[in-house]
Amino acid sequence: MKHYEVEIRDAKTREKLCFLDKVEPQATISEIKTLFTKTHPQWYPARQSLRLDPKGKSLKDEDVLQKLPVGTTATLYFRDLGAQISWVTVFLTEYAGPLFIYLLFYFRVPFIYGRKYDFTSSRHTVVHLACMCHSFHYIKRLLETLFVHRFSHGTMPLRNIFKNCTYYWGFAAWMAYYINHPLYTPPTYGVQQVKLALAVFVICQLGNFSIHMALRDLRPAGSKTRKIPYPTKNPFTWLFLLVSCPNYTYEVGSWIGFAILTQCVPVALFSLVGFTQMTIWAKGKHRSYLKEFRDYPPLRMPIIPFLL
C-alpha cells in the first residue's frame, strides 16, 4: 500500500513546520492534526486550521487524505485559531450569569436600590411572574446544554466567551434593574396583558424545547451527521413546514412574550437585538441546507414564515 508524505507549512510565512512520513491514505485531517501536535504540542488539534491553500477554507476533520486533490506528497497550510474553549463551557457560563444576576436584583440585595429597599419584595404580581419566567428560561437553557444539545464543533475561540458574557450578562442586569425597581409600573392593560404575554411565553418555550429535541434526534451521539429536519408527531415541530430554524422563531417569540409581560424597554431592545442576530444565523443555516440538500423543501424560509 502506497503511503503519503505530508508537509505542513505556516499559512502566513510559508515556513516549513512539520514533515510527516508514511501517512496512511485513509488518514483523516483529524488524525493528521494529532500527528502534528506531537511535534508542536502548543498547538493542540482544536486550535489548528489546516487547508490546501494558504487563503483557502479550513479542511474538515473528517476529510480523508486520499480523497483530497493532492499527490502522494501533500502540502497543507496551518493557521493558529488561538486558544479554544468548549461550547459546553461557554454556554454554561453565559447562561448561568443572567440567572444569578437577575436574582440579585429580584431580591434587592444591598447597594442596588438604596438601603431602605434592601431585601424588600415588590407588591406587583407581574414582577414575581417575570422572575419565574426569566429563571425558567435560563434553567431550561442550562439543562439543554448539559443533556440535549449535540455540538457539531467541540470548541470556539476563548475570546468569544467575553463577548458573549458581556451581551447576556449586561442585558440581564439592565432589564432586571428596571423590572425589579421599587418604582416599576405594571403593564398598561393589567391582567389581560399579563395573561396574553404568559400564554405567548409558555407556548414558545415549549416549542423551542420541542425543536431542540427533534434536532437532537437527527444527530447520533458523537457524530457530525446532518439531515433535513422534518416535522414529527409533536405539533410544535410542524413549524418545520414553513421555516428552517423554528427554534429561533420560538426563541424570539418567547422574548416578545416577556417584553409584553414586563412592558420594559430593555427587554424590547434585547428582543430586537436577539432577533437580528438569530436572523443572521438562520439565513446562514438556510443557505447551508439549500447547498447541501438538493431536495430541500422550497417553501421554507429561514426564520419567519413567508417573509424572512
Swiss-Prot record:
Keyword entries, A-Z: Acetylation, Endoplasmic reticulum, Fatty acid biosynthesis, Fatty acid metabolism, Lipid biosynthesis, Lipid metabolism, Membrane, NADP, Oxidoreductase, Phosphoprotein, Sphingolipid metabolism, Steroid biosynthesis, Transmembrane, Transmembrane helix
Lumenal side: 107-124, 181-189, 263-264
InterPro entries on file: 3-oxo-5_a-steroid_4-DH_C (IPR001104), SRD5A/TECR (IPR039357), TECR-like_N (IPR049127), Ubiquitin-like_domsf (IPR029071)
Gene Ontology BP annotations: fatty acid elongation; sphingolipid metabolic process; steroid biosynthetic process; very long-chain fatty acid biosynthetic process
Subcellular location: Endoplasmic reticulum membrane
EC nos: 1.3.1.93
Main location: endoplasmic reticulum
Phosphoserine PTM sites in chain numbering: S58
Keyword Lipid biosynthesis set for record: yes
Transmembrane stretches, start-end: 87-106, 125-147, 159-180, 190-216, 246-262, 265-292
Pathway: Lipid metabolism; fatty acid biosynthesis; Lipid metabolism; sphingolipid metabolism
Reactions accelerated catalytically: a very-long-chain 2,3-saturated fatty acyl-CoA + NADP(+) = a very-long-chain (2E)-enoyl-CoA + NADPH + H(+); octadecanoyl-CoA + NADP(+) = (2E)-octadecenoyl-CoA + NADPH + H(+); (2E,7Z,10Z,13Z,16Z)-docosapentaenoyl-CoA + NADPH + H(+) = (7Z,10Z,13Z,16Z)-docosatetraenoyl-CoA + NADP(+); (2E,7Z,10Z,13Z,16Z,19Z)-docosahexaenoyl-CoA + NADPH + H(+) = (7Z,10Z,13Z,16Z,19Z)-docosapentaenoyl-CoA + NADP(+)
Role this protein plays: Involved in both the production of very long-chain fatty acids for sphingolipid synthesis and the degradation of the sphingosine moiety in sphingolipids through the sphingosine 1-phosphate metabolic pathway. Catalyzes the last of the four reactions of the long-chain fatty acids elongation cycle. This endoplasmic reticulum-bound enzymatic process, allows the addition of 2 carbons to the chain of long- and very long-chain fatty acids/VLCFAs per cycle.
Subunit text: Interacts with ELOVL1 and LASS2.
Name of the protein this chain belongs to: Very-long-chain enoyl-CoA reductase
